[in-house]
């Protein structure tokens, strides 16, 4: 029997199999593989870092087998495991040493590891983890191959000491809470670290710590600014592959996240989550200044700028500042002359989408804004607002010269012309006025 290698305890997926896994299953697979590799190092087995581990640490897809290779023949176990497929019990034995590290819910003060488990079924923590990974593999093979033989399972113990433990049935480490036993002291050591909530992987830049090395690898990209995942359509880059996958939906136009209440679809799960609050009426984000509540934190952040008066978005052309980036984007069209919104009916173009929407009502005759007092309807909300002044008697437009007030801005503008005509002509230089040639007066 040859020395143990990482490939003896590894699971490999084809591209089709990988795409059948959901996010939770992929994370579980990644953690199990990384944990297996760390166990080999911990046991003193010198192994070079496999490509699979490098891919997992970088957040890449761990695809090592091609589709035609998977179909050509059933995947067999490497080296000395090539002759037999595994039984259900063998699979359980193989997973029990890694599942406990993944699921950290068995946290009790009186939990001590003195002897190991007889089987996965005895401990709820182990059983949940084993069933999760087993279902992950079973679902994948059923979708792709419809055959139980097309799956590689973790092999458990391969060195002579571990085989002796398995054959004799001696288990030295026990969990008092569930009566569960473990074959390895390393399992106890690792479990204690998880039970204590230890975060072994620390960032040298900022000191932030993580429980898993893959999480630290992802975090480091914040400091380096590395964005290895690039969109082929627009060139935009991301730090994580999951963010790139979400971004690609923009180009495809796909909206896979649908609201069960109203049927509206969204291209991002976070957008759907925010939308659901419309139906529930939930507004968890409250302004400390005025008490106004909002559905999302981003909306609250935009609102708070009203109180501070801050205008962080400045136009490079004219220096005008805005409190929202969207307003700056719209403003820039004045300088560029961009009129991107075109009417399909008459071909007229507009700088703003809102202007196009109002214009379209001229063709349709739609008047969606109705006065509750008299029932009169209008095409624009601003027109309705001005109309309501008739009923309230309000005169918000005041002349600075004489103090006279008006209910329309247009009426105020007309009124101002009276003051302009009444103002006398002031001559600053009398000499220039005297030097002006006078017309000849003829007396008949």
Curated annotation (Swiss-Prot):
Keyword set, alphabetical order: DNA-binding, Metal-binding, Nucleus, Repeat, Transcription, Transcription regulation, Zinc, Zinc-finger
Pfam families: KRAB, zf-C2H2, zf-C2H2_6
Ranges in coiled-coil conformation: none
C2H2-type zinc finger segments: 201-223, 229-251, 257-279, 285-307, 313-335, 341-363, 369-391, 397-419
GO MF annotations, alphabetized: DNA-binding transcription factor activity, RNA polymerase II-specific; RNA polymerase II cis-regulatory region sequence-specific DNA binding; zinc ion binding
Primary location group: nucleus
Domain named KRAB: residues: 4-75
Transmembrane intervals: none
GO BP field: regulation of DNA-templated transcription
GO cellular component: nucleolus
Listed SMART domains: KRAB, ZnF_C2H2
Subcellular location: Nucleus
Organism domain of life: Eukaryota
Family label: Belongs to the krueppel C2H2-type zinc-finger protein family.
PANTHER family: ZINC FINGER PROTEIN, ZINC FINGER PROTEIN 737
Protein's job: May be involved in transcriptional regulation.
Name of the protein: Zinc finger protein 506
Source organism per UniProt: Homo sapiens
